[in-house]
Curated annotation (Swiss-Prot):
Listed GO biological process terms: cell-cell junction organization; detection of hypoxia; face morphogenesis; in utero embryonic development; lung alveolus development; mammary gland development; negative regulation of cell population proliferation; negative regulation of macrophage cytokine production
Originating species: Homo sapiens (Human)
Protein name per Swiss-Prot or TrEMBL: Transforming growth factor beta-3 proprotein
Keywords annotated in UniProt: Cardiomyopathy, Cleavage on pair of basic residues, Disease variant, Disulfide bond, Extracellular matrix, Glycoprotein, Growth factor, Methylation, Mitogen, Secreted, Signal
Glycosylation sites: 74, 135, 142
Signal listed as a keyword: yes
Illness: Arrhythmogenic right ventricular dysplasia, familial, 1: A congenital heart disease characterized by infiltration of adipose and fibrous tissue into the right ventricle and loss of myocardial cells, resulting in ventricular and supraventricular arrhythmias. Loeys-Dietz syndrome 5: A form of Loeys-Dietz syndrome, a syndrome with widespread systemic involvement characterized by arterial tortuosity and aneurysms, hypertelorism, and bifid uvula or cleft palate. LDS5 additional variable features include mitral valve disease, skeletal overgrowth, cervical spine instability, and clubfoot deformity. LDS5 patients do not manifest remarkable aortic or arterial tortuosity, and there is no strong evidence for early aortic dissection.
Amino acid sequence: MKMHLQRALVVLALLNFATVSLSLSTCTTLDFGHIKKKRVEAIRGQILSKLRLTSPPEPTVMTHVPYQVLALYNSTRELLEEMHGEREEGCTQENTESEYYAKEIHKFDMIQGLAEHNELAVCPKGITSKVFRFNVSSVEKNRTNLFRAEFRVLRVPNPSSKRNEQRIELFQILRPDEHIAKQRYIGGKNLPTRGTAEWLSFDVTDTVREWLLRRESNLGLEISIHCPCHTFQPNGDILENIHEVMEIKFKGVDNEDDHGRGDLGRLKKQKDHHNPHLILMMIPPHRLDNPGQGGQRKKRALDTNYCFRNLEENCCVRPLYIDFRQDLGWKWVHEPKGYYANFCSGPCPYLRSADTTHSTVLGLYNTLNPEASASPCCVPQDLEPLTILYYVGRTPKVEQLSNMVVKSCKCS
């Protein structure tokens, strides 16, 4: 037993010197030609599978593609590019890192105004909703560092309520348009109308992110009862000519003791920390810097913007153009003629240095299991769809194929 223990210690000591060479990555390194061949075959199978085709359709000889079909193809492609651009501009940092670092907290109180400015009389009788407006323009420059946003409002008891419980729903107010609804649903709650006061919280991260990206979209939030303009019997039937009113009361909005005090009452409201407010959790940029690089350099994203301009040896997205005719032998895809499918490649160094016990154990594991991957591998993180125009017989089709373009990579 003692001899086996001594042998194990000797092996671990020797592996201390070998860990440096083993700690880059155990993922198999392939040459470009082999990678392209594998990627081409994968794309061939992906496209046919996504189109539910067992074999490529017969190519159709077309002298020209109708304008309407080309317009549909171009508009679809542009819409996808726009959506990806907005997602990139408004996205947060990678989740694991953003969860780890401490957040700066910003509080924005509801903008106070006259009573009628915080009410929407949607129905002929009664008050069915409340509006809450906020100015968050001071943090617009740090919009990409938004981690989470919460809307908080204090429900206060309503002793004169005619019901014990009522359902409320929170909406983002949208700019009026005849083609879309004027509200976007965020969440709902069933609440007691009496009882003790309680704070209500709603996750409004996506809404606030949109406000920070486009200031003109900030039209406020609205709390409304579930079915305004109707009151229901216990069996679900509508009571005609009787309209439900909001009996849930909120601090800072329904304070009857402040009514009639004019500017003095509104000033008191502004200083009341129980008023409706937003809580924004922001990650300071310096906390996302790479601590190992002496300067204040922002951690780079391993995407096409960085990788295509730099000679990065470690994990990065690499350009790979697929020509439908030359690489796949396909003539049935009319648009595009080809596209950058890209791929991920490069070693992923361990997070810990090579002289730690952690790396030593992993090095031993790699030695005993050469086919396994104990260290991270370079894999796709963000993928974009591809829009194609093709014919089945003489019928044109425009299709969107999901996850066809590698835009960024990560070590996983």
